[in-house]
Structures are given as C-alpha cells and as structure tokens.
Design a protein with these regions (language model features):
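C-terminal motif of bacterial Sec signal peptides marking the signal peptidase cleavage site
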Residues: 17-20
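Extracellular/periplasmic Venus flytrap/periplasmic-binding protein
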Residues: 99, 144-145, 152-254, 289-297
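Extracytoplasmic "Venus flytrap"
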Residues: 36-68, 86-95, 117-119, 184-192, ...
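Extracellular/periplasmic periplasmic-binding protein-like sensory domains
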Residues: 247-318, 376-380
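Segments of small-molecule ligand-sensing domains
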Residues: 306-314, 325-376
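Beta-alpha junction/loop-to-helix N-cap segments that form part of ligand/metal-binding clefts
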Residues: 28-29, 33-34, 61-63, 73-148, ...
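Bacterial signal peptide processing site
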Residues: 22-25
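Periplasmic-binding protein-like
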Residues: 48, 104-117, 137-139, 180-185, ...
Length: 384
C-alpha cells in the first residue's frame, strides 16, 4: 500500500516566529513573573514529564528532544524573553508520578506540561494537573480512558489505542493473513489496555493469551504457550525492553512466529534487546508519523541540533511544546488562559493540523505500521 499523508504545514522556523515578548496588565508578585497571574510572559517554564532514566528512557528522551527543539526555536526568536524547559524524570513509574506532578504544580512559573509520556503515569499525575488548572499535552500516552475523566487540562496530539488497536488487528488479519493469534500484555495501564482492544478486535482469531510483568527476564512459560497455541502471529502490548527479550527467547526456541507490537516498542532498544537477527520482520504499529514526513524543516532542524534522526514521538513532542509556546506568544500568561487557548487551538503542526475536541482528543488521527528491516525500524504503510 502506498502511504498517504495529508499535511499542510508551514516551515518550522515560521511556526516558531511568535509574538515578541512584552508586558500585559495585571499585578506583580514578590516572586517575579509566574504562571499564576503575572504582568509579563517572561521567565516562564514548560515542563517535560516522562522517563529520562530507567527501562523506557529512550522514549522519554525522544520526546524531550523534540520539545527542546521547539523551545530553542522560540527562544531564538525571543531572546529577551526566553522560556525554560524544566524536566521531571518519572522513570515511567506511576508510583513516582504524583510527587513529581505536585512539584511541577508548586512551581508557579510552570505554565504547561509536555506529557506525561506514558499512560500509567498519566493516570496518576493528570488529576493533580487538572486540580491545579495546569495544562498537560501528551505526545505519547495512548490509553483511551485517559480522556474520559473530565480533566479539562488534558490534551493529546495523537490518536489513542481505540484507533491503534483495531488498526493492529486489521494489519494482522488483512496483511499478515493470520488466522491464529496469541495476545500477550505486560499488565501495565498502556500494555494491557492496548492488548485488550486488539484481542476484542480479532475476536475468534485469538487462540490464547498471556500476561507478563515489566522488568521480567525469563519468558520461557510464554514461549511454551506460543508454541502450543499454534499461533501464526503474536501481538504484544508493552514496552521495548520486555518485547526484545520475548522475541529473543522466541527465536532461541526456534519459533518463526511473527511478532506484532505497539508503539511502546518502537525504539532501537527493542532491536538491541532482541538481537538484530531475531528482531528482523517484527511489525510495529504507532499512531505517529514517520519522522521524515514531518512538515517544514523539522527533520533537518532536528538532525542539525542532535546529530541524529528524529525518533519515536520527537515530532509529537515538538508539536505539544509548540502549542504551549503559541499560547505564551499570544500573551497568555496565566494557567487558566493557557488552558482556554489550547482548548480552542486550531493551527498546523509538523505532524498534523492540531485541533482538540471537548475531551482533549485530536481531530486528525492516523496509524502507521512499521517493520524491522536490516536492523532498522522503517515505515511500512499507513493502516487505513
């Protein structure tokens, strides 16, 4: 299938040529310019909330790099009124999320959050952001239930697993032609949620299921179940560290079963964990745009800044940060004003035109299939 992408996106540089910094009416506070209601839009912070260390650190670093690129571009255009990126390293751990969220809330100069990156930590942190009126735009948390909590500060720039799950099932059925599928999840908010949707979408084609745990090392019981099930393909809902070990152990056991995984596995760390030979042929679904198809000069700008190609969710991280930067550029200097601005946002980003519904979901959604080929993760096709 020939990939179809519809983008009407201006140059990244033009998108970041925001309104110059200036004062607005209102009272000052003793602490200086803050997001709580100051007279100026200078000295504000945008927080990144996600894993920068731990087993899923690569995905968080990808997002932070995208957000930083957007902020650096803004600061170049507004040198006398810069915005700071503040990082909150959750390690992807829901248990750490509440304290970190409260830390961000308590810093009144924080005007918005890019993240949380993962669904489990989002479930733990977003109620705190909502209570404080602090906007949180996730570039990567895909559990559908996150949008069903009435959080007026919750937004995401990509489709959720209610679109990714059926798309993965469609690929398994229509492209791989699998009639027998085993579904495995890692018991996480994200992994189990996505796997359950895939399972429901596949219906009678599911011949067996299994649940593993994050940080698990020995997957031999699951490999045995895969063999005995007669599955032609396996869908795994979880992250790249466990997926890589699972695929390695499948290969070591002589299984040729095709492994299909979700966006949490779309990282080179998967190939490292599985080994190049074992990883070959893996199918990865993601509600994310291939980085080289991002609009404007994003791809070239990212490579210049980091001497590397954009990775999973780097472009989405850029877009999430840019929405908040546009609010600042428009003179929105209170948290309440930023939330209102984001709720009515309707502008081109580098991944799509960004517009949100009443629940914070994006108006444009696409899901892509990627494959591991020659030791690299490459686009296969948009699943339509």
């Amino acid at each position: 299938m020939r990939p179809i992408i519809k983008l009407g996106v201006p140059l990244v540089a033009a998108a970041l040529a925001l309104t110059a910094c200036g004062g607005t009416s209102g009272g000052n506070t003793a602490g200086g310019n803050t997001a709580g209601g100051d007279s100026k839009k200078c000295d504000l912070k945008i927080g990144f909330f996600g894993a920068l260390t731990g087993d899923a650190a690569n995905l968080g670093q990808n997002i932070q790099n995208g957000a930083k690129l957007a902020i650096d571009g803004y600061n170049t255009a507004n040198a006398d009124c810069k915005v700071t990126l503040e990082s909150y390293d959750s390690q992807g751990d829901p248990a750490q999320a509440p304290a970190l969220a409260q830390k961000a809330v308590d810093d009144k100069s924080v005007i918005g959050i890019v993240g949380p990156a993962f669904s489990g930590e989002s479930k733990a942190a977003d109620p705190i952001f909502s209570a404080a009126g602090l906007v949180a735009i996730t570039p990567s948390a895909t559990n559908p239930a996150l949008a069903e909590n009435g959080w007026k500060t919750f937004f995401r720039v990509l489709g959720n697993d209610a679109s990714q799950g059926p798309a993965a099932a469609k690929y398994i059925s229509d492209v791989l032609k699998s009639q027998k599928v085993m579904v495995v999840d890692d018991a996480s908010e994200y992994g189990k949620g996505l796997a359950d949707i895939v399972k429901s979408s596949l219906g009678a084609k599911v011949v067996d299921t299994d649940t593993v745990q994050q940080k698990q090392i020995d997957f031999s019981p699951t490999v045995t179940k895969i063999r005995s099930s007669g599955a032609e393909s396996v869908f795994f809902g979880g992250y790249y560290a466990e997926a890589g070990l699972l695929k390695k152990q499948m290969a070591d056991a002589g299984l040729k079963t095709i492994l299909v995984v979700g966006d949490g596995v779309k990282d080179d760390g998967y190939i490292t964990a599985a080994g190049k030979a074992a990883a070959e042929g893996t199918i990865i679904t993601c509600p994310c745009l291939p980085p080289d198809k991002a609009g404007g000069t994003f791809y070239a700008d990212f490579k210049k800044a980091y001497n590397a190609e954009p990775a999973t969710y780097s472009a989405e991280g850029f877009d999430a940060a840019k929405v908040i930067l546009d609010a600042i550029g428009a003179g929105k200097v209170t948290r309440a004003d930023v939330v209102a601005y984001v709720a009515s946002y309707d502008k081109p980003g580098v991944t799509k035109t960004l517009k949100f519904d009443a629940k914070g979901e994006p108006s444009e959604i696409s899901v892509w299939a990627y494959k591991v080929e020659g030791g690299k993760i490459v686009p296969d096709q948009e699943i339509k």
